[in-house]
Amino acid sequence: MKIWLSGIYEFFLRYKNIWVEVWKIRKELDHPNRKKDESEFLPAHLELIETPVSKKPRLIAYLIMLFLAVAIVLASVSKVEIVATAPGKLTFSGRSKEIKPIENTIVQEIFVKDGQFVEKGQLLVSLTALGSDADIKKTITSLSLAKLENYRYQTLLTAIEKESLPVIDLSNTEFKDSSEEDRLRIKHLIEEQYTTWQKQKTQKTLAYKRKDAEKQTISAYVRKYEGATRIEQEKLKDFRKLYQQKSLSKHELLSQENKAIEAQNELAVYRSKLNELESDLLNVKEELELITQFFKSDVLEKLKQHIENERQLQLELEKNNQRRQASMIRAPVSGTVQQLKIHTIGGVVTTAETLMIIVPEDDVLEATALIQNKDIGFVAAGQEVIIKVETFPYTRYGYITGRIKHISPDAIEQPNLGLVFNATVSIDKQALSSPDGHKIELGLGMTITAEIKTGERSVMSYLLSPLEESVTESLRER
């Protein structure tokens, strides 16, 4: 082992001594310094060997290396913005009002034109639904009849409770929508029903009186035969005493017993008739009371039905009136009419179809941008946005700045972009400046491109990211 180490030591020591000796005579080994014209007269191979190399290529190489070093330093230090690009358009803020009908209707009259300023509550357009006027007229007629029927049964109920003639007064304004014919008909019905009820009561009252008279007559006979029976019984007792004393014949005793039995039988017959009449009187009295009860119950039931019918008809009339009012479309706010889509009288508009948009006086433009799925993870509310309007080249007219105001939590499907997220961007100004200094107002629906600043990165990382991605992906291959 020592021999091997000493051999290595001798080897390096030898070359060290050689290098030291050569270094001592290094100047003697150089070619003599010759002038340019002296070198030109030397043989070609000596001229090539002894002519010094030009310093320009070396200087250029140094400059290139210096430039590369500066470029690497700047690329490592300098930062560039990370931008997410999203297409979109200019829209008004949520204060703009879309005017839509509530049902399929026909345009009756148009009172405004595109670009016109309207006040709140001003009539914009008059629509009419098929059959709406007929429905209202029919409901009013039915409601007036229902009110008359209610009055009819209410009047009858009052007459029943007070047991007096019904007081009929149909001159009230409540019945102004009903015809004279209907009012007369109701009046006659009230009188007829009340008269019929009174006739039924009168008939039963007369029947009761007849039965009561019969009762009085039978009661008299009962009292008569009660007295006759007592007398005949007393006489029978006396006849039996006389018969026992042999002062009276048996034939006379039997004759008296027969008279007593006949008196008792007559008394029993009339008592039976009296009981029957009392039962009939109770029945007639109950029937008399039932006539009033049934009539009152029927009146109450009919009154309840017609009150409910009137309530339903009143709701139906309110519904039809609301339907008519809804067809008279008025401005919900003061503002400017835009995107008017109806121009033909008699044209048909469908449910929820946008007829026009009312832009309030203080409304402002906003931008809506469609952020792609690949960028949504880096976009957040409050980030700065540069908005370029495609109508006006930004190199000549400039651009608009703004900030992300809101991002929808759910994606929507777009035919060309796939699933995207809708973002609202507030803009700092509502106009651009032309090259000659004129102010150009921005308009609703203009297409824009939103460049959202999501962060910063160094130029070096930007340049090396493709290489890093390629290396990473290549290392994953089998």
Curated annotation (Swiss-Prot):
InterPro entries: MFP, Secretion_HlyD_CS, T1SS_HlyD. It comes from the Bacteria. Its main location: membrane. GO terms for biological process: killing of cells of another organism; protein secretion; transmembrane transport. Pfam families: HlyD_3. Residues 99-478 are periplasmic. Keywords: Cell inner membrane, Cell membrane, Cytolysis, Hemolysis, Membrane, Transmembrane, Transmembrane helix, Transport. The chain crosses the membrane at residues 78-98. GO terms for cellular component: plasma membrane. It is a single-pass membrane protein. Gene3D superfamilies: 2.40.30.170. Involved in the transport of the Leukotoxin. Belongs to the membrane fusion protein (MFP) (TC 8.A.1) family. This is Leukotoxin secretion protein D. It comes from Pasteurella haemolytica-like sp. (strain 5943B).
